[in-house]
């Protein structure tokens, strides 16, 4: 238990320290964008791509945002960062959204952004633990997590908690990095692959990276229906050259160093390793969704 608490504190400190730097460079969405493969990313294009990622995730999970009768009433974003997803959905689709993050600094920033956009009555943000969320059973009809679950070692418990707070029929949506699935003859990844993933995790305070097969198994064990997966790796890699270009520009590097310190610089180093791991067929960007039984 002490190790878990220590890890949670490290994650909170990481985001408390580095959030301001990334917000200044790329805005309130602290996640990858969804691009057409082969696109050349720019800052304006990235702002469109990050909100497209949200729309694509909901579309993938079969969540209707067009039909008022089917539109979600209450969405939870687990690992909400600066609240960008909640703010976007509340503003565009008039959906009530709640975000939870382990970082008090992120909640403060999210609340300030909500106030600036006049959305205080449509969104709310809480500091809390994704493994023990302060919500009632069945409270949300969409439970969504975008690039958060890898900070947690017990991913099955993370998903179980998502399912608990989901209402009957709720969409459970996980967007995350995964490692390659093992072949039928393999018991584990190769030693050099394990070493690569550990280096990536250590740089950005991740606990571990799991396979797509693992996520399907966890959702299956929780009796979710309509489980499906999609490989979106080619849709996110156009962002990497832009990240490197901006981060290693004079303005970008100084901003990262002054506002984010070593924590922010380590993110760029991790993305360099992630880019190579993708090229090597080790790392993927994956969408996984299921539906809680009625």
From Swiss-Prot:
GO biological process assignments: alkaloid metabolic process; methylation
Top-level taxon: Eukaryota
Subcellular location: Vacuole membrane
GO cellular component: plant-type vacuole membrane
SAM motif II: annotated segments: 138-146
PROSITE patterns with a match to the protein in the record: SAM_GTMT (PS51581)
Reactions catalysed: picrinine + S-adenosyl-L-methionine = ervincine + S-adenosyl-L-homocysteine + H(+)
GO molecular function list: S-adenosylmethionine-dependent methyltransferase activity
InterPro entries according to UniProt: Erg6_SMT_methyltransf (IPR050447), Methyltransf_11 (IPR013216), SAM-dependent_MTases_sf (IPR029063)
Annotated region described as SAM motif III, given as residue ranges: 165-174
Pathway annotation: Alkaloid biosynthesis; vindoline biosynthesis
Motif Vacuolar targeting signal mapped to chain: 137-143
Pfam families in UniProt: Methyltransf_11 (PF08241)
Primary localisation category: membrane
Record-listed E.C. numbers: 2.1.1.-
Family per record: Belongs to the class I-like SAM-binding methyltransferase superfamily. gTMT family.
Complexes and interactors: Homodimer.
UniProt function note: S-adenosyl-L-methionine-dependent N-methyltransferase involved in the biosynthesis of biologically active monoterpenoid indole alkaloids (MIAs) natural products including vindoline. Catalyzes the conversion of picrinine to N-methylpicrinine (ervincine).
Protein name from the UniProt record: Picrinine-N-methytransferase TMT2
